[in-house]
A protein has these predicted regions:
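Generic structural signal for small/hydrophobic residues in well-ordered secondary structure
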Residues: 2, 9, 37, 59, ...
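Active-site pre-lysine segment of PLP-dependent enzymes
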Residues: 8-34, 38-71, 84
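A generic structural signal for well-ordered alpha-helical segments
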Residues: 27, 136-137, 174-175
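Conserved core segment of the aminotransferase class I/II
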Residues: 57-126, 130-135, 217-220, 224-226
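Residue-level recognition of strand-loop junctions within catalytic nucleotide-signaling folds
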Residues: 82-83, 113, 156-158, 202-204
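Conserved glycine-rich beta-strand-loop-beta hairpin in the small C-terminal domain of fold type I
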Residues: 109, 125-133, 144-158
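A short linear hydrophobic-aromatic micro-motif
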Residues: 140-144, 181-187
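PLP-dependent enzyme catalytic core of the Aspartate aminotransferase-like
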Residues: 163-165, 173-181, 188-228
Length: 228
């Protein structure tokens, strides 16, 4: 099978509708089962992406209440399955966790009643992204694909210094000295992640501005300490 995520974590990259349609057709022609992670659907800033289910009768689509609906911790989601997988998936679900409780299901249904508030959150995420892109050193994002969805930026450390930087050391020092938390890229990519870090902008816009100021104030001294 082929597993894809759009919008993606950790990069925030959103696949074009044409690319999703093309991949669906390729998978169908080559007998490959497509598993599409659409957990960050709704959190896009330029266009609303299509769903793989609109282009394929055999694709598996996975979604969640955690991200767009702001229900992280409820551990609720859903799958859209082709007919040939319904029975076996139902058996697995019944044996693994039976199902969510009735109050959880009622709460999830209520989440569909207020898209105005949810879309306001998306506007805030977009503003937060723009703050970080504007305020942080441009070297962070020079070679990265545009982050048009989710609420993450995947920053590149290779252009910040002539000396190679280790992402794990970098994020630990930034947390300890600048009091800004982010995630080392090695959590997502064991081969090249040591040169990248993921920033989340799911918080308040004020927090994004404060974080940018702290990083900009801290970064020169940190880079200087490495060369001394």
């Amino acid at each position: 099978g082929l597993l894809l995520a759009s919008p993606a974590n950790p990069t925030g990259v959103v696949m074009s509708n044409a690319d999703i349609e093309h991949i669906c057709k390729w998978c169908h022609a080559n007998g490959v089962r497509l598993i599409m992670d659409e957990i960050y659907h709704g959190l896009t800033f330029e266009t609303r992406p299509t769903s793989a289910v609109l282009h394929s009768d055999s694709a598996i689509v996975v979604n969640s209440f955690s991200k767009y609906f702001c229900m992280t911790g409820w551990r609720l989601g859903w799958m859209i399955l082709p007919d040939d997988l319904l029975e076996i998936t139902e058996r697995l679900a019944q044996n693994l966790y039976i199902g969510p409780s009735r109050p959880m299901q009622e709460g999830a249904m209520a989440a569909f009643d207020d898209y105005v508030t949810l879309d306001q959150n998306v506007l805030r995420y977009r503003e937060n992204r723009d703050v970080l892109l504007r305020e942080l050193p441009p070297e962070f994002f020079g070679d990265m694909a545009p982050a048009d969805g989710a609420f993450y930026l995947y920053a590149d450390l290779t252009q910040l210094s002539k000396m190679p930087l280790n992402a794990t050391d970098f994020v630990n020092a930034m947390l300890r000295e600048a009091h800004v938390a982010c995630t080392s890229g090695v959590d997502f990519d064991q081969e090249q992640g040591h040169q990248h870090l993921r920033l989340s902008y799911a918080g308040s816009t004020d927090d994004m501005k404060k974080a940018s100021c702290r990083i900009n104030s801290w970064l020169p001294s940190y880079l200087k300490s490495l060369s001394s």
